[in-house]
Each structure stands twice: as structure tokens, then as C-alpha cells.
Amino acid sequence: PLYSYKVFERLSAGTGYTYFGDGNYDEVFYDEELDHDFASWVFGDSMEPTYLNGEVVLIKQTGFDYDGAVYAVDWDGQTYIKKVYREEDGLRLVSLNKRYGDKFAPYDEDPRIIGKIVGNFMPVEA
């Protein structure tokens, strides 16, 4: 059987610590049922080879778990999928693809951890 996933174009911080999709989502299918709170698209190659452009990432709304895990982060109007390290003045967002430099999200710009990436897949045709 194929399982349906709602994949949001963008995840945003709501009031407090709730998150919601922007209302625009695609329904995609995969042959496994995977536990998650949100699903979003991978755009670009900055997280290759683990997360490929066009794949779906599955997110659990865990808050910050540990340094070096891969999280969805809402910062400066964008959703980033990156390895995250907490530093004194902000969050360091690290790409897996070495061609990309780190990004730094200062705490005074209110970067928010949406949740931890708990899975990824390339959708299958229904």
C-alpha cells in the first residue's frame, strides 16, 4: 500500500511554539508509513548526499535535542534544513555539502527550531 503525506512548501513559526504550514501543500506518496509531525521539501543541493533536491523530509516537533543533529529552522522568513550547533550568540547552521559555508542565525533575530529531521524519502508515483 501507499501512504499519503502532506508536504508543505514552507513552515512558519506561529504564535508561541506552534508551527503550521503556509496552506500550500502537495500530497505525495511513499510505500512506508513514517511517524512525523510535519513534512517539507528539500530545495537545492546544500544537504547532499544525505538529503537530495526534490526529496521530502519528515520533522518531529522536538525542540532542540543535541548539537549536530539535523533540524528544520525558521529564520529570517525562511525554513532551513541544516545541522545545528548552539553557540553563545546564536545558532550555527551547517550544510552537509562542503561547497556551502555555514550560516549564522543570531539569537536577536529569533531563529526557531521547528523540529528534528527524523526521515526522508523520494516520493513514489501513486
Regions found by a protein language model. Give the residues of each.
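Short coil-to-beta-strand transition motifs
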Residues: 74-80, 108-112
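Short, surface-exposed charged micro-motifs
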Residues: 83
